[in-house]
């Protein structure tokens, strides 16, 4: 009899079913009102006196083992239920992690930054809510200058001197005010213009503008910098600079790259010419240098600017600028970058 009880003790110790149904069956088997321990205690009076001590010890051991096993598994099951409520079911098999991707605008912007960083340009940033001085006046656009009409501006209604910047040239002004030449910096960022939203234009877009100020800077330096950029960005080294007008540069030019006419899309985006405009550039006007406390008799330089969306549309053959702002995951997940 004692050996049989010891066998039950080992079975109770080995029990490890971690579910409520099996645990309840175990409890009833050993601790229930009609369970094994109840039968053994009833049998105690029939045991010879010389065996009662040993018999009582093994019965108590079996009871202690069974009670401890029930308590242990109950605590584990309760802890599991609590973890489900707070953290989810921690026993579920792991699911694959879907890694997001960078926005195409961020991908292209970072590529541009890396290209210019390789030739010594740093990155400068400034506020998107700007004042009239940094956005217009310091850039050779005094009040009532007709060229201000070239940029439809969002003004702050409560303060006409405060506005949403129309270009990142305002960052260049702030940089020149706080740094002495030589200067090599690019200013990426978001800009705002009161334009109708269509497939080709938006009231919010991104620019990257560059500024180089030093002694004896020439237009040839500007051209070589742009040739380097277009070769690195597009794999194309054929460009042309068309005379143009910007208040803050003189002379000024539009930057065109030769895109070619290999596909129907090429004909459409270049209007059959093979040439495509990507930005503007020019030699910094001496008045702009004066406004930033830089002596134009000692220093000169060049500036350039380009739209990030326009470049992204070229690289990825995207026909509608609005797609960048619709947050359509089906569109965004197509773009991958080394993060």
From Swiss-Prot:
UniProt-listed Enzyme Commission number(s): 6.1.1.20
Binding locations of Mg(2+): 250
Pfam families: Phe_tRNA-synt_N, tRNA-synt_2d
Keywords, in A-Z order: Aminoacyl-tRNA synthetase, ATP-binding, Cytoplasm, Ligase, Magnesium, Metal-binding, Nucleotide-binding, Protein biosynthesis
Class of this enzyme: ligase
Keyword Iron: no
Signal peptide: none
InterPro entries the record matches: aa-tRNA-synth_II, aa-tRNA-synth_II/BPL/LPL, Phe-tRNA-synth_IIc_asu, Phe-tRNA_ligase_II_N, Phe_tRNA_ligase_alpha1_bac, Phenylalanyl-tRNA_Synthase, tRNA-bd_arm
Required cofactor(s): Mg(2+)
Quaternary context: Tetramer of two alpha and two beta subunits.
Name the UniProt record assigns to this protein: Phenylalanine--tRNA ligase alpha subunit
Organism: Flavobacterium johnsoniae (strain ATCC 17061 / DSM 2064 / JCM 8514 / BCRC 14874 / CCUG 350202 / NBRC 14942 / NCIMB 11054 / UW101) (Cytophaga johnsonae)
Gene: pheS
